[in-house]
Amino acid sequence: MEKIVPPAVRIEELRRILREHEYRYYVLSSPTIDDFEYDAMMKQLEELEREYPEWDSPDSPTHRVGSDKTEGFASVRHDRPMLSLSNTYNYDEIGDFYRRVSEGLQGAPFEIVAELKFDGLSISLIYEDGMLVRAVTRGDGIMGDDVTANVRTIRSVPLRLRGDDYPRMLEVRGEILLPFKEFDRINAQREAEGEPLFANPRNAASGTIKQLDPHIVAGRNLDAYFYYLYSDEPLAENHYDRLMQARQWGFKVSDAVTLCCSKEDVYAFIDRFDTERLTLPVATDGIVLKVNAPAQQDLLGFTAKSPRWAIAYKYQAERVRTRLQHVSYQVGRTGAVTPVANLDPVLISGTVVRRASLHNADFIAEKDLHEGDFVYVEKGGEIIPKIVGVDTDARSIDGRPIVFTVLCPDCATPLVREQGEAAYYCPNAEGCPQQQKGRLEHYCGRKAADINIGPETIELLYSRNMIRNVADFYALTEEQLLTLPGFKKRAAAKLLDSIEASKARPYQAILFGLGIRFVGETVAKKLAAVYPSIDALAAATSEELVQIDEIGERIAAAVLHFFSLRQNRELIERLRLAGVSLEAETVSVPVSARLAGKTVVISGTFEKYSRDEYKAMVEDNGGRMAGSVSSKTSFILAGSDMGPSKREKAEKLGVRLMSEEEFLRLIEE
């Protein structure tokens, strides 16, 4: 008998799930479900809240817009909220949209403008007297990040408007994108440098525009399309003509924009781009429909989350059927073994797909995969497409179930699986060639030792037995390099110069490059801030490590395990003898200990001092800064417009919110 879940319980469960996915999508830019699943859960929650209004709550995901606002940029309030659009997936719901618009306009005729829905980062540009003065991300819809310096590097963004008939004050909204060709180039470069790949062009665009160095942004060739204009001064009489006006002023407006006089025109537009979108140079994830007349838009107004005069139509992810040839396995630098499906080549979203992710052993068992199975594959933006189903009716009687390997595919060592882990690992860290080469590539990455060497050269050096661990780089000689195929004196000198320069890399970069399990770039910075030398970190206890914000028992155990191994201690000594930086250049000395042992989070905007000045005050008084709220947070220095997610988590954990005045009194006592 199916268990009946009380409405109140289901409502809270949906809110919890949606909040988690909003955080992963909007804050981490790392979604774990697709838009279709998210929208289905959101619709279910909206229906339950309508049916049971006594369980409605102002902090429900149905009453808010997600946030992509990050620390490190000035927060700016939008003159007009940047709201999201309601989504629909079929023609019946488009018909419902037409009905609602008609009722809202009391039967008056209206036109619809159909546009492509670009899949990038929403941006608001402010122009004064034809000059770009500010660029702000969507953020939480109310507040966003000032990324003007980065946006100025995008060549499709006009710094000065063309002509002279533009209004004195103008806001233009659009989408920042990374073209597919540029995405492939950047990922190829990152792979060669041993850096993690971007999952999709949207993540890459978002990560790029939030870089603190505009030079990095300029080197990634972002693009931008624009789709809405605001001004208190007169503009063209309707939305379509305003887009044409924007094009004349120098903005990039999609050629696909179409004026539709009927539902049939809209359906024809959707059908057309169901296939044409697959050949576009940038990512799209649907169609946007807008009422054309601004006066009618004003009459229809807004809900708490979205305009009533616009809606988004989302295409289903492209799904194809192909044959699973066999399963191969890859070994990462940490020893994790990942299964990969090798497929009969098939065309998906304009690219030929030969492989698909199988995640782990549990996924293979859950799908009950057999050799030679016909599988359904989707490519929803990931680098490697995913298998979403199996055509069991087409299964051959000779097909054998796929059993996850018990041996490392590279060194034949029996695999292990730690309790609570989904992945199997090869424990032969020092003898497994793939792990060794993976660690060498990781160490040379731009955010680590930054040695200018590609995986092909590392493979060559490894095959000649010239390198086995990262300390071996510092023992290489010109004579050795000149024995390699294709290496001349100039190439050898360039590599040796890069290796020499890596000795001066910051301590936290070298710590990251050591490849300690679970110690990524951010964790390495946190560890280096508390333990300003490798020796101090090696002497730390588990109890001390877990006191650091966002350092849990798992990370602490990995750090302790790394330093417990003799070969790692010997590696560190070799790096020290080679002259590699293993301690911070300077250690800041607090001017007081009023905040000693306190972990502080800063959120919002302030009147008396800037965020950076308050961060300096915390550190000068012996406190430690953290970017997110946790059970280890001592208090939050809360300004106006504090982020809703931080406020919600603070209330849940009972973390104190401290005002500017309270904080200044505290450090002046």
Curated annotation (Swiss-Prot):
Q: What is its EC number?
A: 6.5.1.2
Q: Where is the composition biased (Basic and acidic residues)?
A: 61-71
Which residue numbers delimit the BRCT domain? 590-669
Q: GO annotations under biological process?
A: DNA repair; DNA replication
Q: Does the keyword Protease apply?
A: no
SMART domains with a match to the protein in the record: BRCT, HhH1, LIGANc
From what superkingdom does this record's organism come? Bacteria
* InterPro entries named in the record: BRCT_dom (IPR001357), BRCT_dom_sf (IPR036420), DisA/LigA_HHH (IPR041663), DNA_ligase (IPR001679), DNA_ligase_AS (IPR018239), DNA_ligase_CS (IPR033136), DNAligase_adenylation (IPR013839), DNAligase_N (IPR013840)
* Annotated residues for binding of Zn(2+): 408, 411, 426, 432
**One MF term from GO for this chain?**
metal ion binding
**Pfam family for this entry, one:** HHH_2
Which cofactor is recorded for it? Mg(2+); Mn(2+)
Q: Which residue intervals make up region (Disordered)?
A: 52-71
Q: Which CDD domains does the record cross-reference, listed alphabetically?
A: BRCT_DNA_ligase_like (cd17748), LIGANc (cd00114)
What keywords tag this UniProt record?
A: DNA damage, DNA repair, DNA replication, Ligase, Magnesium, Manganese, Metal-binding, NAD, Zinc
Q: Which residues form the active site?
A: 117 (n6-amp-lysine intermediate)
Similarity field: Belongs to the NAD-dependent DNA ligase family. LigA subfamily.
| PANTHER family per record | CHROMOSOME TRANSMISSION FIDELITY FACTOR 18, DNA LIGASE
Function (record text): DNA ligase that catalyzes the formation of phosphodiester linkages between 5'-phosphoryl and 3'-hydroxyl groups in double-stranded DNA using NAD as a coenzyme and as the energy source for the reaction. It is essential for DNA replication and repair of damaged DNA.
- What is the name of the protein in this document? DNA ligase
